[in-house]
């Protein structure tokens, strides 16, 4: 618009000119047109140039300099559009339908040739433009002493020419050309990476060395290492020079951003492939430092050498065309190392490292489930992930991805509760290294906790995992004999020690450093859990949180401990004492008081048993069929402090019954006025059964022993008679007898009455090696326990509230779980008051539903109709 306005103004001047002046302008204008065409077409000589300059002088004399500029630039544009641009794009027409993997090596030659041709044409047009600029500058210098304005003329015209050139090419740009550039830089950078990594050096040495170097190498004047190093350097320089020439030519035609985007995307693609190659599926080795070293060795050295070749380090970002590159850098003494990194190289380094961190982070997050399964062997991968997240701050991506993996791979019906718990503990340990405060661990663990709360065996599995000797790992790793509880207590102690040191053993300088490193809690943090800097991950607390309260865990442990103690054949309780002491530290002495009393019962039982046996050694001799007290070992329980014990009637054989009576009498003598009340169905009995052809040993329950001992006097029994003698129901007898039948000791046959079966002792066992030395732990084999389970105890305790619940549902029709819970707490305040948790109530109501007393629909409980 500025040029057009200037032309209008100059045309008004023509009205004031004489006829001779107008005639001179007309002749000069015609000559100017003719000489412009000759110059641009390349058909002119020095005489034409002199004539052209004289015509420019004449037109400028009459104020028509803007006409000169506009017409010449428009003529250049038309010529370039018909010739240079069209010819340039024709080189790439053959690749419009090809995919990048079908380009082949010839595309490199085609690209270089096309750029060389268009650069030559551009240089010629610039030469023509320089003639115009020189003519305009000469006229202004003669008419004015303002040298600065004449320099501005040159900058202005060349800037307009460059814009015209770039816009002409961009408006005719084929869609596949950026892809061709990307492919070219990708191939060249892969070749460069192979050189820097030492691959393919031998093949390239002959091409890289000049004749003198080849002769020196052949004659032995150059050693092998020097030759390889020289070959690598020359190969690098040659490749960078070729790439630099392409980039320089692209810049010269206005494709600065396109070129930089092409080789930048190629660099990032190569870096991504390198990260994938180094990381792989090996989680036991840290790869972050190797990736950073590769970035320094290949991409940054290439960029430093490239920008130095392009002259950016000298001109500080100004190209020959006057455009500034955003990748400009300062000079470097050598391509092999950056002594003083420029601002451009520093920016590139930050970009590449961030991309590497993000790529490695995404790889590790995608495989986080496998990494945690292999923890702690996969600790290096966890440490890499931690550093990546600290750099990128994308913790939320980890949370979302890992929760999705958990729901798809772990929280399924096919996964056992034990496996889920072990994975949960490993998750806590691994993520604690990434997030010591546990902010993101809370979000990751929530789906696992919600899922486990819906499984009936969760409490039992947690207690078993805490107290067994596998170290809390599914594969049994860890210190032999160590329980997960011991491991967690050691971890907690180490965390507390670290915190203690931080709080009380820091000087003022360190305190200032700690204060300067303080960061606010992330937005995901729960403010109710305290500040991040004062919070630590409590694994045991997280396990307890699954259950709902520590009382439930302690009750389950009491049941499990009671079962273990009752099944012991000796008084070795060191492991149990150690576990109780650890639980006391975490849950308090009051919670574990009953467990301590149970252990003290075992200790007292051992002492009492020893005293009774000592007293029996001075007694009278044994009569026939009489059993010695030495064969009996008792466990004396303080019943009020033990969980409810399963009791069933059992009539023992006479000698055994007398032995128990004698033992009780001697206990009464020692512990007057206390008396023993035998639980005859509990305990274990060691038997040796002697047959005609062999002897067999078993360790069985008292009921099993009572059954087989009845066959000592009588070889055959009916089920009814045997049940009456032993004093147990027939259905209970059926379950126990199956054991002896399966061992080949008893045989079942049809009696005289077809409706009754007879059990007969097998005197001779044909399969002599079948069952020798076999033992039985009846509680585990038959699914029976000596102690009532927590569920059974809860059902018994909750029975008194069943009528209240039925009455509420009769009055209100249907009620939600929370409403039933709150109503019971409000009205059941008399002894016994309602003190159950929401989970316990839900478990009891589920039992009523299974008994078809209630229905559960749409989250509401109602009476079964």
From Swiss-Prot:
PANTHER family registered for this protein in UniProt: ANAPHASE-PROMOTING COMPLEX SUBUNIT 2
Function comment: Component of the anaphase promoting complex/cyclosome (APC/C), a cell cycle-regulated E3 ubiquitin-protein ligase complex that controls progression through mitosis and the G1 phase of the cell cycle. The APC/C complex controls several key steps in the cell cycle by mediating ubiquitination and subsequent degradation of target proteins such as cyclins. The APC/C complex is required for the female gametophyte development and is involved in several aspect of development by controlling cell division and cell elongation. Involved in the control of endoreduplication.
GO BP, sorted A to Z: cell division; megagametogenesis; protein ubiquitination; ubiquitin-dependent protein catabolic process
SUBUNIT field: The APC/C is composed of at least 10 subunits. Interacts with APC8, APC11, CDC27A and CDC27B.
Listed pathway(s): Protein modification; protein ubiquitination
Disruption phenotype: Gametophytic lethal phenotype.
A cellular component annotation (GO) from this entry: nucleus
Lineage of the organism: Eukaryota, Viridiplantae, Streptophyta, Embryophyta, Tracheophyta
UniProt keyword list: Cell cycle, Cell division, Mitosis, Nucleus, Ubl conjugation pathway
Record localization: Nucleus
SMART domains reported for this sequence: APC2, CULLIN
Name this polypeptide is given: Anaphase-promoting complex subunit 2
Superkingdom as given in the UniProt entry: Eukaryota
Tissue expression per record: Highly expressed in immature flowers. Expressed in stems, leaves and flowers.
Family: Belongs to the cullin family.
InterPro entries for this protein: APC2-like, APC2_C, Cullin_homology, Cullin_homology_sf, Cullin_N, WH-like_DNA-bd_sf, WH_DNA-bd_sf
Cross-referenced Gene3D superfamilies: Cullin Repeats, Cullin, Chain C, Domain 2, Winged helix-like DNA-binding domain superfamily/Winged helix DNA-binding domain
Major place of residence: nucleus
Molecular function terms, GO-annotated: ubiquitin protein ligase binding
Signal peptide range in chain numbering: none
